[in-house]
């Protein structure tokens, strides 16, 4: 498959075969995620982060450098010319003359799509508001493939927390629809998965459960995908306080789950997963975070036309 110069904006843009192709390349690159290679020697990737990020920004930075490339960019809007009034469009037009690819995180939904329509080099969406986060989804699927005893198509996946504002769960739901996985959505009423996504999944013929009770789904879940409540997306702090701390996984919570059930989280966590869970056999969120490096190495090498 040819991904050279292709933009990575949304999981909706990919077929199952294309996703599997990316994950297969990630598996081949995983050994190099610690020791490195030189296939991107001389290449420059711009990482433009208008919102705070730890894992995504640093794992992209690591991925580029493990491939032998270098990075330029900024880690907040405050350190860019945005503070002087420069538009995103103008920034993209400038940066695409400096770099061979652009990794963009922006608070505005649709920003990455707009950037891709302007840029002369591949744009990789590292999160656009409450929209999409495709490389997070790819590493989530890679984690399920590596850590679960079942194939992705046979999994029961419980997605828990902020399903309204959480872009990671939007992207993940679309991707899991390609595999026919069974999905359970657990959230407070005011943070339910958007109706447009539910309707999309139903048209795909997926088995979907919506509930506000975590206990309803724990017994049958192969994957418990926890998310934090997206405080920064709430227009009213009082509304956030009403739902903060709604769901929390503890060792006691996990007493009734299957022996092979895994707990995932895109991180950062607040209080959704007790620290004591880290030592249990179910915890996979730190390994999940590491998998971001080989997956992003795979994405970068593909869009930049590097043969591995």
From Swiss-Prot:
Superkingdom as given in the UniProt entry: Archaea
Enzyme Commission number(s): 2.1.3.2
The protein's name: Aspartate carbamoyltransferase catalytic subunit
Pfam families the UniProt entry points to: OTCace, OTCace_N
Catalyzed reaction equations: carbamoyl phosphate + L-aspartate = N-carbamoyl-L-aspartate + phosphate + H(+)
Top class in the EC scheme: transferase
InterPro entries in the record: Asp/Orn_carbamoyltranf_P-bd (IPR006132), Asp/Orn_carbamoylTrfase (IPR006130), Asp/Orn_carbamoylTrfase_sf (IPR036901), Asp_carbamoyltransf (IPR002082), Asp_carbamoyltransf_Asp/Orn-bd (IPR006131)
Keywords of this entry: Pyrimidine biosynthesis, Transferase
Gene3D superfamilies: Aspartate/ornithine carbamoyltransferase
Keyword Transferase: yes
Family: Belongs to the aspartate/ornithine carbamoyltransferase superfamily. ATCase family.
Pathway assigned in UniProt: Pyrimidine metabolism; UMP biosynthesis via de novo pathway; (S)-dihydroorotate from bicarbonate: step 2/3
Subunit structure: Heterooligomer of catalytic and regulatory chains.
Entry binding sites for carbamoyl phosphate: 55-56, 105, 133, 136, 267-268
Record-level Gene Ontology MF annotations: amino acid binding; aspartate carbamoyltransferase activity
GO cellular component, one term: cytosol
A biological process from GO: amino acid metabolic process
Gene behind the chain: pyrB
Function as written in the Swiss-Prot or TrEMBL entry: Catalyzes the condensation of carbamoyl phosphate and aspartate to form carbamoyl aspartate and inorganic phosphate, the committed step in the de novo pyrimidine nucleotide biosynthesis pathway.
Record: residues binding L-aspartate: 84, 167, 228
């Amino acid at each position: 498959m040819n991904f050279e110069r292709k933009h990575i904006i949304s999981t909706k843009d990919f077929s199952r075969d294309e996703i599997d192709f990316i994950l297969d390349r990630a598996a081949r690159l995983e050994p190099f995620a610690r020791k490195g290679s030189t296939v991107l020697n001389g290449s420059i990737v711009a990482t433009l982060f208008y919102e705070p990020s730890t894992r995504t920004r640093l794992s992209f930075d690591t991925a580029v450098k493990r491939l032998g490339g270098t990075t330029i960019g900024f880690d907040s809007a405050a350190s860019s010319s945005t503070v002087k009034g420069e538009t995103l469009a103008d920034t993209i037009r400038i940066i695409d003359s400096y770099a061979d690819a652009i990794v963009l995180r922006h608070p505005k939904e649709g920003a990455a799509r707009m950037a891709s329509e302007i840029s002369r080099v591949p744009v990789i969406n590292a999160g656009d508001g409450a929209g999409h986060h495709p490389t997070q989804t790819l590493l989530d699927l890679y984690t399920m493939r590596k850590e679960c005893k079942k194939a992705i198509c046979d999994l029961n996946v419980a997605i828990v927390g902020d399903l309204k504002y959480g872009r990671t769960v939007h992207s993940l739901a679309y991707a899991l629809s390609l595999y026919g996985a069974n999905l359970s959505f657990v959230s407070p009423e005011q943070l339910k998965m958007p109706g447009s996504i539910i309707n999309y999944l139903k048209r795909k013929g997926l088995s979907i459960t919506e509930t506000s009770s975590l206990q309803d789904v724990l017994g049958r879940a192969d994957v418990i995908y926890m998310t934090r409540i997206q405080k920064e997306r709430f227009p009213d702090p009082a509304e956030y306080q009403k739902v903060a701390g709604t769901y929390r996984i503890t060792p006691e919570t996990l007493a009734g789950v299957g022996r092979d059930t895994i707990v995932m989280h895109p991180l950062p966590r607040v209080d959704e997963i007790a620290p004591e869970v880290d030592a249990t056999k179910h915890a996979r969120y730190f390994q999940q975070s590491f998998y971001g490096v080989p997956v992003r190495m795979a994405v970068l090498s593909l869009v930049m036309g590097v043969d591995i």
